[in-house]
Amino acid sequence: MALKSGLQLYTYKLTGTIATPTAYDLFNYVRDESVDMDRTEVDASSRASVTFRQFVPGLSNGNVETQIMHLPGDTIFDAIQNAFFNNTILLMAFVDGPLQAGDERHGETGTISVSGLWGAFYVTNFTEQRALEDAQVHDIRFSPTLEPVTNAVPEYKTVSVTL
């Protein structure tokens, strides 16, 4: 296993379902990206706790925060923009390797394991940044939801890919 930089990670918009995607569309115009894998804490304290509060894990977050280049006319940019303004869902995969031959950027070959967060997401932030000395970008937040066809929840999974 080798360490990877953010440059070696991949963001895909999927068609089909999470279980059986029919198309993987690689989105190369991503800058920084963070996958928030945290949980709420549920207070389970009682008088039996005596001195310390007791907590159990609650719901996972699963938000993905990213910056994308402002590229009207790009099919994935347009899909993200439309999902925000129309309150529609996108199927996405935020993974550590290519999901199909032809998407390799860093010398990946043979059969590889690819891991990451897969799921259905609403776009809940589409803030346009207009810095004087930087490229025009949008701050995006993908917020997890149930997949409309199967009611599947987002999942962190590993798949085997032959390139």
Map each language-model feature to its residues:
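Compositionally biased, intrinsically disordered low-complexity segments enriched in polar/Pro/Gly
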Residues: M1-A2, G6-L7, T150-L163
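Short beta-strand and beta-hairpin "edge-sheet" elements
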Residues: P98-A152
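Structured, beta-strand-rich domain cores
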Residues: V56-G107
